[in-house]
Amino acid sequence: MQTFLVIIFMMVIGALIGGVTNVIAVKMLFHPFKTYYIFKKRVPFTPGLIPNRRKEIADKIGQVVEEHLLTEEVIQAKLNAPTSRDAIEEIIFKQIAKLKENHTTIQSLADIVDIDFSKTANQKLDELISDKMDNFYLDYQNTPIQQLIPNDIESSIDDKVALLPELLFDRARVYLKSEKGGADIASMLDTFFNEKGKIVGMLQMFMTKESIAERIQHELIRLTSHPKAKAIATQIIENEYATMKSKQLNELINETQYQAFKTSVTELALRYVDLEQTSHKPLHTIMPRFISFLETKVSKTLTDVIIDNASKHLSPIMKKINLRQMVEEQINTFDLAYIEKLIIDIANKELKLIMFLGFLLGGIIGLFQGVIAIFV
């Protein structure tokens, strides 16, 4: 009985020594958190292993993450994976679909950055039109009008000008044959007779005012069909047209006229565009075809562009981020108690197994020691 108690006692003592040793060893990984001194001498094993080697551990973890976990090759492979491509395209498609479902307007988007869109856009459009017109006027103010007109437009205008004499005579003939034309001739004849009294008296000895008016009307109508009259009118119109085309731009439109013209053009353009009203309309009502185009074409193309550009610029991005340093700095900011909790949460089973193994090995060693103590 005494022999059995000795063996059991030795086993218990060995188990306690082995188990407590391992428990202390595990605790010494983290504790103490700071260095202790006795008589200005540093107490051995203070601070604990992890607090003492914290910077080295952080550096090694950063190195492992940068060189083996989040490498350029790994990230590029993940970006080009079908699952990543589908996820990016789905996000883009959902964002485009939101434009159709909600009442997002240009102004509501501008409000995010505190911008009055219509006011700003009107100002920019006014400046753009004014600058373009000013540049054109300054560049071509000494250029003949004929050189500013495109050839096809000039040919079209030439054709219209060639028809102008016949058109004028046709309109004049219709007017002279009308009641208003006859009445206007009679009215002008009355005015003439009132101003030229003596001549009227002599004419009225041979003809009445009505017959004189009819004769004048008849001759004027005949004149509209006379070839010589047409030739004279044609020559005058062609000469004036040629003179106008040969004039320089600043001769046809002087500075004052140009400024007035520019103001009219910009005001007309701003009224036509009406950015105030347009900026408060939902985007899908302003450009429905563009939204459909985004859905059918742009979503896939934009996905490819995002992935391609991300892959191309991944190397400089990784260098600028400096993943190793970022991980190291982040770990160094962690509280030691948090690091302890983090490691214990990860390796809890293994640490408990180490402590249990200490009790087990200590007990086995104690058993052998007890047996040896009895029989030796």
Curated annotation (Swiss-Prot):
It comes from the Bacteria. Keywords: Cell membrane, Membrane, Transmembrane, Transmembrane helix. It is found in: Cell membrane. Its main location: membrane. The chain crosses the membrane at residues 4-24, 356-376. The keyword Transmembrane helix applies. GO terms for cellular component: plasma membrane. Pfam families: DUF445. It is a multi-pass membrane protein. Belongs to the UPF0754 family. This is UPF0754 membrane protein SSP0953. It comes from Staphylococcus saprophyticus subsp. saprophyticus (strain ATCC 15305 / DSM 20229 / NCIMB 8711 / NCTC 7292 / S-41).
